[in-house]
Amino acid sequence: MPRLHHYLSNQAFLVLLLFSSIASAAVVEHVLHIQDVVVKPLCKEQIIPAANGSLPGPTINVREGDTLVVNVINNSTYNVTIHWHGVFQLKSVWMDGANMITQCPIQPGYNFTYQFDITGQEGTLLWHAHVVNLRATLHGALVIRPRSGRPYPFPKPYKEVPIVFQQWWDTDVRLLQLRPAPVSDAYLINGLAGDSYPCSENRMFNLKVVQGKTYLLRIVNAALNTHLFFKIANHNVTVVAVDAVYSTPYLTDVMILTPGQTVDALLTADQAIGKYYMATLPYISAIGIPTPDIKPTRGLIVYQGATSSSSPAEPLMPVPNDMSTAHRFTSNITSLVGGPHWTPVPRHVDEKMFITMGLGLDPCPAGTKCIGPLGQRYAGSLNNRTFMIPERISMQEAYFYNISGIYTDDFPNQPPLKFDYTKFEQRTNNDMKMMFPERKTSVKKIRFNSTVEIVLQNTAIISPESHPMHLHGFNFYVLGYGFGNYDPIRDARKLNLFNPQMHNTVGVPPGGWVVLRFIANNPGVWLFHCHMDAHLPYGIMSAFIVQNGPTPETSLPSPPSNLPQCTRDPTIYDSRTTNIDLSY
């Protein structure tokens, strides 16, 4: 009888826990009105697509376990999709918002409602447009707090503050796709350029703090193409999460975020009452490229009681090409073992891939002036394949309905040629082949619940730089980073299998490598791409098709009845319409 009573008590507890979890979940509804608005961060007014009339767009707040419903009403002049960057989308791949991968775009004058559950994630993520360069102005923070009654795994902060970094061009956003990686005119903090730039001296983000209080900074790098350093004068911060995954508390005075990455950091106002600049500065990782003279973008920490005449203290920023500082921060982030939603690293690997990545060339059309090396156009590739985005129908629909001719499932596990990846020299016809990758819509099929390990090897075919690789639909363990060519014997011994941080976006070091591991437990078509938008037209991307599992619960659902329909989309990424010197 005592054993039976103990069993029944446990069952009752589990039932109560289940009901409390259900009760704590909610349906959170938002509307994003996408329309063209006039803004003036610097000296010129520009018309941009924006959500709800603001730059950045609204912060969306939910709790883990909630269902998020967002109606996107497109009254702009652009085709639009919204991607929920870092959200797992378990059994909701149709809601991922990857243009021509999981859906056709929402055309002007139409709307579409995204609906999905937030499961097993807490922290800061972002939402953003996923059509050409619209992400430059169509983005915002997505904040996922613990379920009601569940604490953070760190002391409760006095206040939470979203801080969103942007990259700004004083030009029509449509022109950004006509030239490769244009230099931006400014960087913004929460939509404000600050006093480093003309016409913005009195428009600066101000964070007012109370001495002795601790603030949770929810930092988002929404810049289109740039990794960013971030620092606050005379203050340290404690990093407690990266990419909405709790981390071992890490005390630092400087952070770096790749495009699309997020950091949650605790800031304690423990200095003398006064004013202190916060500043962000681009990290220029490309090797052999002259470092431009770039001004830091500044905001202000203002202590309660500070006088208006106080001169702000300035942070000593890293130099823009400070690779050692960038690598030190990234490699010191580890997971919070035993924390909320933590899972151990799977030791058995079912599928191993070695993927080379970087820039190459594409032949210049006859009679056209192209601005890449050797008079050619830039291209990009993974394992020497330049990815071509479909134009007629989304890949997810083609896969679900078994429509042929849209993609091939022959993406290779190895590059076609082994060479010295970090010291490329064109000597043979094979070397020339590596410079001019094959153009193909090539994907990799993966069995459901397989454990996949990927070595990403940066190459020096064209000037190497850090590429922030983003995987839709999953987090992955980052087992290790390094420089030079990856050695499968020597470097494998150094991999962290105990407490590696999980990410959805990771910077592959210039002239180096990174090792990822993830469990393919989410059926669907999932994009894997460089999150520098300047590199998307070049084709540094592919996709994984995770096959259905053995049950209806582990298989793809049918698409929603109101999924946007395709017409031929003129804004589809196509490197054959870019990299041409258009004088105007």
From Swiss-Prot:
GO molecular function: copper ion binding; hydroquinone:oxygen oxidoreductase activity
Glycosylation positions in this chain: 52, 75, 79, 111, 236, 332, 384, 402, 449
Source species, domain of life: Eukaryota
Cross-referenced SUPFAM superfamilies: Cupredoxins
Binding-site residues, Cu cation 3: 130, 472, 529
Annotated Plastocyanin-like domain residues: 33-149, 159-306, 410-550
Function according to Swiss-Prot or TrEMBL: Lignin degradation and detoxification of lignin-derived products. Involved in the flowering time inhibition.
Protein name per UniProt: Laccase-8
Gene source species: Arabidopsis thaliana (Mouse-ear cress)
